[in-house]
């Protein structure tokens, strides 16, 4: 590994190898001093598609600027969660303060915000963009522009950020920097020569990138003498100190002596600590215009410090809140139930704490006849659901079942009343006039060889083609309108398998459309099991019924009487499977003898089975629920 020391020599950068055990000669004290000059601050984030090397480039910046010594360095330094490190993805946006002596000889302060790349976590990206003036658009020099790159680029342009285009991984043998530089230039309207080339792995080009950020990204603008205003762009919960909020100061100064005021709730709190992160927390006592840091407001209730809120002071309160952040809307709903019913209060507490770290998670209590007490949770997508469930199980030691995910439907009855359905058990039983389902605008980027296979897949999912653009001779962008319910489960998996892993997908909500949807119930012994009910398109109802009854026949243990498993739409049965009865051999003791004796025993057994069938109840074991409701089909939504 090579690290670049910007202070050594006069004619450019000197390369230091890891074998030379020298530490970089950058003083870390001055950049932590409070009251930095706003003209010397640059706030920027790194946006890219998943796996294009954001976190590796961030690591190299930490090393080059000297805030992390070479001996303490580890890969993906800013990815602190175990899940992030295991899956190799960034889930939480992280921020860090970097000192940098630019090529003009002046010392600057850079605030880097490392953002996630996965489609489910684009709300984390939008929060980060609201705290920045510039964005480094990172593209893998071996893979080129992908769907999420474009989605995040459009987000950055909407926020009026200065774009610094960069090609990463130029050290790879498969890299094609010239080809992809032209692609980027065509999209953002610059010259191919303005696209920087770096390698996050070796450190090549990183000092030049930092100099370019200083040159291109504008300094933050704000009123240093006005009432304090700071936007909360993230928050975490600490069991000892309560809520820790990450803020970007827009006007005025926040100090530890002031009482802070949350503008959306009008609640005031004592400020316990104010500081910056570089990359560990350093208390500074104050934050002024343009600075990014943390404030500990001494709040224990997680709902008191909402992400997107504006912090001001009680001494000189601001009158207007800061804009630039919208609440994320849940796209997918699923029930989360503790396997042990006594863990319900612990699950409530865990969701409360997790919601502080995860502004997009919504939940409300619900009960199920089959699964007991639990919560109906709203998520941004299937990966988001999986990550939340995994964090609940790991960080809070809970054992959970999640029901099959579904989306929000709007049902209009014949008397013109409207019902919002987030759970199949809420589906109305009366006369339904119309049902509306949410749709999304999907953007798919893929090689031209696979256009036919992908169009066939989208049409099979009730998609409507809206547009087709050739980015180059071998890459095409397809725009489709698709029902959200069709893509949340296994669409991503099917897309990857049909394109040998080359396609990428991004989508955003696009309203709703009229649809022919029905509720399919699963009946055991004539009784509905609410946990297995699902809302599906009428054309796919039969397939769902057959697959669910077949699955349950394998999973439910045999009883002493025959158990019918049926799938029904209303009162009409559409599929049926039987679980054969276990039969005791009542003739085992009869050695020969009269046939009437045997017949008498068989008739007696038949009577018993008949009586058992009328009064017997079928208990569905916990394992059968877990297996039948497992979201394994959604797992490939993870990279």
Swiss-Prot record:
Signal peptide: none annotated. It catalyses: GTP + H2O = GDP + phosphate + H(+). Its EC number is 3.6.5.n1. Its main location: membrane. Pfam families: EFG_C, GTP_EFTU, GTP_EFTU_D2, LepA_C. Belongs to the TRAFAC class translation factor GTPase superfamily. Classic translation factor GTPase family. LepA subfamily. This is Elongation factor 4. The lineage of its organism: Bacteria, Bacillati, Actinomycetota, Actinomycetes, Frankiales.
């Amino acid at each position: 590994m090579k690290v670049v020391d910007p202070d050594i020599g006069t004619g450019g950068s000197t390369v230091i190898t890891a074998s030379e055990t020298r530490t970089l000669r950058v003083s870390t004290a001055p950049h932590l001093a409070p009251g930095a000059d706003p003209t010397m601050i640059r706030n920027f984030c790194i946006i890219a598609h998943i796996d294009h090397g954001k976190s590796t480039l961030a690591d190299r910046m930490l090393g080059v600027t000297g805030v992390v010594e070479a001996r303490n360095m580890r890969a993906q330094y800013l990815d602190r969660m175990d899940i992030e490190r295991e899956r190799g993805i960034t889930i939480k946006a992280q921020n860090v303060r970097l000192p940098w002596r630019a090529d003009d000889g002046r010392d600057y302060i850079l605030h880097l915000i490392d953002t996630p790349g996965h489609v489910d976590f684009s709300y984390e990206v939008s929060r980060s963009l609201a705290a920045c003036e510039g964005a480094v658009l990172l593209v893998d020099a071996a893979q080129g522009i992908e769907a999420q790159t474009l989605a995040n680029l459009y987000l950055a342009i909407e926020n009026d950020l200065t774009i610094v285009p960069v090609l990463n991984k130029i050290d790879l043998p498969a890299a094609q920097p010239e080809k992809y530089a032209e692609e980027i230039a065509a999209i953002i309207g610059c010259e191919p020569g303005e696209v920087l080339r770096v390698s996050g792995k070796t450190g090549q080009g990183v000092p030049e990138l930092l100099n370019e950020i200083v040159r291109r990204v504008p300094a933050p603008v704000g009123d240093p003498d006005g009432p304090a205003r700071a936007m909360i762009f993230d928050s975490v919960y600490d069991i000892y100190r309560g809520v820790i909020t990450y803020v970007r100061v827009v006007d005025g100064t926040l100090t530890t002596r002031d009482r802070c005021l949350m503008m959306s709730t009008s609640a005031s709190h004592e400020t316990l600590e104010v500081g910056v992160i570089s990359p560990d927390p350093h208390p500074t006592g104050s934050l002024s215009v343009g600075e990014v840091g943390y404030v500990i407001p001494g709040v224990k209730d997680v709902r008191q410090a909402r992400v997107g809120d504006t912090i001001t002071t009680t001494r000189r309160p601001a009158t207007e809140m800061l804009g630039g952040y919208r609440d994320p809307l849940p796209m997918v709903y699923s029930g989360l139930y503790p396997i042990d019913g006594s863990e319900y209060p612990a699950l409530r507490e865990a969701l409360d704490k997790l919601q502080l770290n995860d502004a997009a998670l919504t939940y409300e209590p619900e009960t199920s006849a089959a699964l007991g007490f639990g919560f109906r949770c709203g998520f941004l997508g299937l990966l988001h659901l999986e990550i939340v469930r995994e964090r609940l199980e790991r960080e809070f030691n809970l054992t959970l079942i999640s029901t099959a995910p579904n989306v929000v439907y709007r049902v209009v009855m014949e008397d013109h009343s409207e019902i919002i359905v987030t759970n199949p058990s809420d589906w109305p039983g009366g006369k339904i006039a119309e049902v509306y389902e949410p749709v999304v605008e999907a953007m798919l980027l893929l090689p031209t060889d696979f256009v036919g296979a992908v169009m066939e897949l989208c049409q099979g999912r009730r998609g409507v083609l809206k547009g087709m653009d050739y980015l180059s001779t071998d890459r095409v962008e397809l725009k489709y309108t698709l029902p959200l319910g069709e893509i949340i489960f296994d669409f991503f998996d099917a897309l990857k398998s049909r394109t040998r892993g080359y396609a990428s997908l991004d989508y955003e909500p696009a309203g709703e459309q009229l649809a022919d949807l029905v509720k399919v119930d699963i009946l055991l012994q004539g009784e509905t099991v609410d946990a297995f009910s699902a809302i599906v398109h009428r054309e796919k109802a039969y397939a769902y019924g057959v697959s669910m009854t077949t699955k349950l026949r394998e999973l439910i243990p045999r009883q002493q009487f025959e158990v019918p498993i049926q799938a029904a739409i209303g009162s009409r049965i559409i599929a049926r499977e039987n679980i054969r009865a276990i039969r005791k051999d009542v003739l085992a003791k009869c050695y020969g003898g009269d046939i009437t004796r045997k017949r008498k025993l068989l008739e007696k057994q038949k009577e018993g089975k008949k009586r058992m069938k009328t009064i017997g109840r079928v208990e569905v074991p916990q394992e059968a629920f877990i297996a039948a409701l497992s979201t394994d089909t959604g797992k490939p939504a993870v990279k």
